[in-house]
Amino acid sequence: MKQLCVIQHTSADYLGLMEDHLEGRRIRFHYHRPFTEAGIVPPFEAVGDGLILLGGGPWGSAGTRDVPTLKEEVALARATFMSGLPIIGIGLGAQIVALACDGSVEEAPLTFSVETATRVQDDALAGFMPESYVNPVYMRDRPVPPDYATILATEPDGRPAAFQIGDNVFGFTGHPGFKRAMAEDLVMEFEEVPPSPGPALDKLGMAKHDIADALVPIMTGIVKLTGWMRE
């Protein structure tokens, strides 16, 4: 049975709808919470069969409000990448993936948007990525994938919404399994919130079925390319 290492950066942001897809395939995962008093960034030995780096709420990586464990997490992601193990980065996690794989980040204010991402590679996620999908983004700063990365999908402004590095490393600016309750908890968890989050919350709530439907092929492609179902 596969075992994944999942790093949280806030109490509110977790795997969300992705949990059911992993559990349904008997893929185990363990949350690590470096932001708690007793929490630390896990050692490489704890990565197991793959690393998932989640979003950071108001935390970023471009220097304005860096997540406190940024250096350690970039080092862990780099070691995981160099070992050939799969990595999934979401939001802040995608920024960490970019930094660990010779990309960069650019400064951007904390934003909360629910827009449509558009696939740009027909074979994205082994052909399973939907042609378009709802892309809920709650993030400060933005990942800039390395030049050798493959852009899988773009946001309405043309910036990357999803990218792939090598065979089994992926970054998503939005959370493919985001729930309205998670966004509400992020708003309540921190003093700093995106401006006027109400409309985005409503839009996220109305899109819940579309998000759940798109997640089915997205997870199918991720699991296939990461090999998490192979013995």
Language-model features and meaning:
Residues 1-5:
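Extreme N-terminal starter segment of soluble prokaryotic enzymes
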Residues 23-88:
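Flexible gly/pro-rich beta->alpha loop and the following alpha-helix that scaffold active-site loops
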Residues 79-104:
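Catalytic nucleophile loop
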Residues 7-9, 34, 92, 174:
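Cofactor-binding loop segments of dinucleotide-utilizing enzymes, especially the Rossmann-like FAD-
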Residues 178-231:
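Acyltransferase
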Residues 99-181:
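Pocket-forming structural segment of enzyme catalytic cores
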Residues 12-17:
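Short N-terminal binding/cap micro-motifs at the start of the first secondary-structure element
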